[in-house]
């Protein structure tokens, strides 16, 4: 695999993931954060609903946000060992001095990743990380790779 990382959006996703106006990115992140806050205040958790709202407002949010990562995405999926493997991988990359985004709450489906991103992105939609190590349930990994092409995938049994 080449050392340079392409940030180009695949042809089939270009219309969805094209850059939005700055106010739109702000509105998307602000709405998602508000829903997360409201969910937690009302004791409803808030790990999936903010992601659902953001997906409705801006279907290209996930693709565009993770597309900012210069070293790409590592996807961890399978039946057993996802959380441990994800934490070990993120820890190893952090020990190398890289800034790593991960979904630490265990909300391991696409909406959960979007919700986790809301805590890390700026209100302008910028993600300050070099790479992401993401745990995804095997049933949702297929939906994830339709939006984001991981640089590496670890499939566990």
Model-derived features: positions:
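Phosphate-binding loop of NTP-binding sites
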Residues: 7-157
């Amino acid at each position: 695999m080449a050392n340079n990382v392409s940030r180009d959006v695949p042809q089939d996703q270009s219309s969805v993931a094209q850059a939005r106006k700055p106010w739109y990115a702000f509105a998307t992140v602000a709405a998602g954060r508000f829903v997360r806050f409201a969910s937690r205040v009302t004791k409803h958790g808030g790990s999936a609903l903010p992601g659902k709202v953001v997906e409705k407002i801006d279907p290209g949010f996930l693709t565009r946000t993770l597309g900012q990562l210069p070293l790409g995405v590592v996807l961890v999926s399978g039946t057993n060992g996802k959380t441990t493997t994800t934490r070990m991988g993120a820890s190893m990359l952090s020990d190398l001095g890289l800034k790593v985004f991960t979904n630490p709450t265990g909300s391991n489906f696409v909406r959960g990743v979007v919700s986790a991103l809301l805590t890390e992105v700026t209100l302008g939609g910028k993600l300050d990380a070099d790479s992401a190590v993401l745990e995804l349930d095997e049933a949702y990994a297929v939906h994830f790779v339709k939006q984001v092409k991981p640089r590496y995938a670890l499939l566990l049994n």
